[in-house]
Amino acid sequence: MTGRALPLSARSGFWLGVMGAALLIGAYLRLEQIAIQVLIDDEWHAVHQFITRMPRDMFLDFGYADYSIPLGILDWYQAQWWGVSELTLRWPMLVCGLATLVVLPLYVAGPLGRPTAAVFALLIAQSPLLVIFSRMARPYAITLLLGWIAHGAYQRYSPGEHAIRHGTARGQVAAGATYAVAAALATWLHPVIGPFVAAPLLWGLVQVRDVPPADRRAALLRWLALAVATGALTAAVVLPPLLAHPLSLAAKGGIDAPDAQTLLGVWYAWFGTPATGVVLACLALAALGFPQVWRAIPAARTGALGLLLTFLLVAATGPMWSHLPVTISRYLLPIVPLLLLAVAAGTVRLAERIAVPPTGPRRALALLTMAVPVALLAVASPLAPLLRRPNAQTQHLVNYIDFRPDHNPYVPQFAAMPLSPFWADLAARPPGSVRIAAAPFYFESYDWDAPRWERLSTQTVVPGYLTGLCVDRRAGEMPRDPRYRFANAVHLADADDLAAKGIDFVAWQKPYLLDVAGHSAPIGADTASCEGVLREKFGAPAFEDSHIIVFSVPHRNRPAAHAPR
């Protein structure tokens, strides 16, 4: 795409300015309120490992709840060196998420032109899945970046005729090493990415057939050298846990499978919108642009093969929760940049057609056309509610399990939970002026109603840990240890911790029976005995109804806060 028909030259500095603006927007969305985010859901998988196991034990076990071996080991060492907090658990994903905003647009700017790269940069900057996974202590943002780096590196190494005759030995070795390391590390971080990063090798083997006979042997040897190096690196980190604990992976298979509703729902996840019209518009633009992407970027071809192989693996093995669109969308997360790149290419192609003949009004309309997919996805974005202040629950699964409210299973779940008027009454106070520690905390978010409490109260809600107060150990609670320095949770047994984190109230959720769709389950029965301990520690409640008990927390030099009544 030359961009000659557009109102601004394809080489205009304007497009670099747009890419710079996209970087700022993307950085803002990924860093907004990140320091106050509560650790939730699958983010706890690695924590449960490194607080009870040594690195050598983690190296030999993928775990039933896939915690990502290298992240678990890294977190263990961070705990020993300088202590772990929510931010230290998330920084690798944040770094990779921010790097993606730079690396991918720059990579496509050459073959597709700056206008397409600029629109692409804006689209990935505001992609809800890319934003959410960049903020999450799970490996998806890392494997997405490593996966596409592997594909790009392979193209520089590719044992084709041009590479054999014109590539420099040093450059090819560097490209091959980059591919091998990126592919092995991505697979170690999240084994399901394996087929995606292996796809370039399969594609390359087929390419060897097209090399002239005189060069075919050299091409095959170069391919074999990279395949052996990549296989050896991958085997060195994947085989030990696979052989030591083969059931850790096998036990997660044959449980669920994607169905028609799953395959429909993933498009809303990948495009990041609840609006069917927006999904259809983006699909139309992607269909218009994908042929250009396919021709111009070889990594798009190997990437498409990798995505197909990954989907076939998931469909064949039936991992747990694979009937949910959110699960398939993250297993195939590398498709998001590819789809958005096709949308960007289709948008620029459409704009070029509109700009001919190149009259002033047509060129202006062409420029506006290029903003259409960005505007449509921004207006319908599920990220908007997450920008509310304060909001410490942005990583809660309710926000992204399904962007369509009528398909979100958390909506009826939370509607069935008891809700005290205490939360809405707190809204009379200035937003963010009160901090509440709520207990019992459930790291599996389907039992943690804090997003609704924060939305109604406009105040900050953090987990109140019962460990050391009335229980010895609970899943989803950190032990009282100087190595574990969570900023967005508080030990209720520790008066100094309550004071340091500015807790005004402790809200105790009374046990209840949750009835959803005819299924009943007791919630809180395992910690019911803690109520008496809390009453003894904090004294008379500041508020109590049939659902919750609220205790005021006095601090030195500050009187106890008064709860709304």
Model-derived regions, located:
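Start-transfer (signal-anchor) and selected internal transmembrane alpha helices
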Residues: 1-28, 109, 297, 364-371
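Membrane-proximal helix-loop-helix interfaces that form the catalytic/acceptor-binding platform
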Residues: 18, 23-161, 172-352, 377-399
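Extracytoplasmic
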Residues: 382-565
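Membrane-interfacial, low-structure loops and terminal tails that flank and connect transmembrane helices
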Residues: 1-12, 159-173, 210-220, 352-364
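Internal/C-terminal transmembrane anchor helices
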Residues: 362-386
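Hydrophobic C-terminal alpha-helix "anchor/cap" residues
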Residues: 2-4, 78, 186, 426, ...
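Glycine-rich, flexible loop segments associated with nucleotide phosphate handling
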Residues: 16, 167-178, 215-223, 327-331, ...
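Alpha-helix C-cap/termination motif
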Residues: 110-111, 353, 357, 429, ...
